[in-house]
């Protein structure tokens, strides 16, 4: 998997101070996309174990509340295994920190993926420049923010906000 940028101490992509990973590669090609340079899967740099270690180190700061994964498209078949591995490792080391993930897919299309065990918040839906929004953390009004919640018996549900 390639990535475009690792942004430490990001306050724009999720609640609190976060480490943000922008992956490369996206087939959605949304009109008006703010990150068109990330569409090519070979754009940016190859993500390595050293990058994962760097993310883990950055997240050790008490000011950091979690990891945000954006794109490109994190849930594309070419990215999903590495994204799952990153999320699993982060949750193993920092179970109290949240993972936010942006995708052009709808949550119901990807809800059974292994990565969803580790993700706490999903912003889903393709960017649509004809539908401006004032909703936080979304680029267009058709996008949804889903928050994982656990019932008293430990069952997991996704609640739209």
Listing of model-derived features with the role each one plays in the protein:
Residues 119-128:
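Non-cysteine beta-strand/loop elements that form the S-adenosyl-L-methionine
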Residues 105-108, 127-130:
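Short Gly/Pro-enriched loop/turn and capping motifs at secondary-structure junctions
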Residues 96, 118-119, 142:
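A generic structural signal for alpha->beta connector loops
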């Amino acid at each position: 998997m390639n990535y475009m940028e690792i942004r430490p101490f990001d306050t724009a992509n999720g609640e609190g101070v976060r480490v943000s990973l922008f992956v490369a590669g996206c087939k959605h090609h949304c009109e008006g996309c703010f990150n068109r340079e990330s569409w090519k899967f070979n754009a940016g740099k190859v993500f390595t174990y050293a990058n994962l270690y760097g993310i883990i180190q950055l997240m050790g700061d008490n000011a950091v509340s979690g990891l945000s994964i954006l794109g490109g498209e994190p849930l594309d078949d070419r990215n999903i295994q590495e994204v799952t591995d990153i999320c699993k490792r982060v949750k193993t080391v920092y179970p109290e920190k949240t993972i936010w993930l942006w995708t052009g897919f709808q949550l119901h299309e990807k809800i059974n993926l292994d990565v969803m065990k580790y993700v706490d918040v999903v912003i889903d839906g393709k960017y649509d420049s004809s539908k401006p929004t004032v909703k936080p953390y979304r680029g267009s009004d058709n996008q949804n923010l889903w928050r994982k919640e656990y019932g008293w018996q430990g069952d997991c549900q996704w609640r739209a906000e």
